[in-house]
């Protein structure tokens, strides 16, 4: 059986991995997943990530903890295959009054809501991370 929403699966693996105090989580890799992992690393939500394998690449995320508690408090899928959510540059949401981030897929690539606002771009709201 094929996976219906690979991005939701990625977010769930991160959520479950941190709930179980895992050091790292692995998942099948894709360009979008790598772009999301890059944004999470830049914003300090994960420690690091790497891609292994050639035929079927596997993405490994090294999770981040602060004083024994997970850095990611909540991670939530917004736009999903059955209901895509697009926002213009002035409609981009502020997550937890600016404490969290919205991961946005724009015409210039995957970035945070802040970066999209500065670049004057709108796009698909992939997920919220706080």
From Swiss-Prot:
InterPro entries: Ribosomal_uS8, Ribosomal_uS8_CS, Ribosomal_uS8_sf. GO terms for molecular function: rRNA binding; structural constituent of ribosome. GO terms for cellular component: ribonucleoprotein complex; ribosome. Gene3D superfamilies: 3.30.1370.30, 3.30.1490.10. Pfam families: Ribosomal_S8. GO terms for biological process: translation. The keyword Ribosomal protein applies. Coiled coil: none annotated. The keyword Ribosomal protein applies. Keywords: Ribonucleoprotein, Ribosomal protein, RNA-binding, rRNA-binding. NCBIfam families: PRK00136.1. Belongs to the universal ribosomal protein uS8 family. One of the primary rRNA binding proteins, it binds directly to 16S rRNA central domain where it helps coordinate assembly of the platform of the 30S subunit. Part of the 30S ribosomal subunit. Contacts proteins S5 and S12. HAMAP family: Ribosomal_uS8_B. This is Small ribosomal subunit protein uS8. It comes from Edwardsiella ictaluri (strain 93-146). The gene is rpsH.
